[in-house]
């Protein structure tokens, strides 16, 4: 075996070649309006009710599991809590995929951690691009299931914001029966709870649902997520999860967030986000630099601009940080905008107003009239 003075040569080849997931915080920025990570814009306050920090925590804190189970309408044995839904993504790969042999499948454009998690564990990443309307390409999925052990489907999908057709989800579950786990990522389901498939668990033994407290519960900094599945899958995941996945303070705050009061506060936040989303969507459609605003069932909007790189920089320079989606398949000139407070949404529109001669009813010149005539043709919402 040859020796090297470079310690990085000792690392696995796939890790040396890996491009890490570029989270909003890794990308940085010096803004004061953070609309790039789908976080709730205002902080939440909790007081710790326990001080037993000298003791290791439970692997699965009973009060957290029981409260989330009650919230989800499931028995506690069908719930697992982890360090965010991201850990749930990894646990499925660790439990079901043989490195160098098995594959996961996902349908871009979608959440980037499915790919990164698979690559980290030496598992093949197989992609079946979504159709033009961002729904699943069922024939292509059926033709790509060889050696696939986990299929990830995000609904509402990040970053597009659309729900996946329930009939298509059922079709995928049927295709994968006896072959693969189907993990439905419901990180944003609180913004459209009627679309949850949690009541399907009794009918599909290969169904897994991923949830989080990071979005509607406004606890992104807590890192607390949940995996919902039949008890035999939960027992497998308990074999590969860390012995103490949740710290005592995290479990304490999570339990408070899942109390009746905490759930009511979450629903109030959802109502506010929906109202601000509707306002921002309407205002964006009046912007001359906007080509298309895509309908969203979540706490963000995907927007196609005439020149997204310029728009991104203009807003960045004004302290408004968005998420660039240009590198995602089919999302050229698209930026994702988290729904912030009404004031933050108004700042976005104010920053966009001067770009490409946005129509201004208080200052209509010939140029703005031209934009007004063409915008109704060019702009749309789907």
Swiss-Prot record:
Residue ranges, annotated region (Disordered): 363-382
Gene Ontology BP, a term: L-histidine biosynthetic process
EC number: 2.6.1.9
Keyword Transferase attached: yes
Cofactor(s), by name: pyridoxal 5'-phosphate
Domain of life: Bacteria
Keywords carried by this UniProt record: Amino-acid biosynthesis, Aminotransferase, Histidine biosynthesis, Pyridoxal phosphate, Transferase
Record bears the keyword Amino-acid biosynthesis: yes
Molecular function in Gene Ontology: histidinol-phosphate transaminase activity; pyridoxal phosphate binding
Segments passing through the bilayer: none
Catalytic activity: L-histidinol phosphate + 2-oxoglutarate = 3-(imidazol-4-yl)-2-oxopropyl phosphate + L-glutamate
InterPro entries linked: Aminotrans_II_pyridoxalP_BS (IPR001917), Aminotransferase_I/II_large (IPR004839), HisP_aminotrans (IPR005861), PyrdxlP-dep_Trfase (IPR015424), PyrdxlP-dep_Trfase_major (IPR015421), PyrdxlP-dep_Trfase_small (IPR015422)
Enzyme class: transferase
Metabolic or biological pathway, per its Swiss-Prot or TrEMBL entry: Amino-acid biosynthesis; L-histidine biosynthesis; L-histidine from 5-phospho-alpha-D-ribose 1-diphosphate: step 7/9
Residues bearing PTM N6-(pyridoxal phosphate)lysine: 215
Quaternary organization: Homodimer.
Alphabetized NCBIfam families for the sequence: hisC
PANTHER family registered for this protein in UniProt: HISTIDINOL-PHOSPHATE AMINOTRANSFERASE (PTHR42885:SF2), HISTIDINOL-PHOSPHATE AMINOTRANSFERASE-RELATED (PTHR42885)
Family classification: Belongs to the class-II pyridoxal-phosphate-dependent aminotransferase family. Histidinol-phosphate aminotransferase subfamily.
Protein name as annotated: Histidinol-phosphate aminotransferase
UniProt organism field: Yersinia pseudotuberculosis serotype O:3 (strain YPIII)
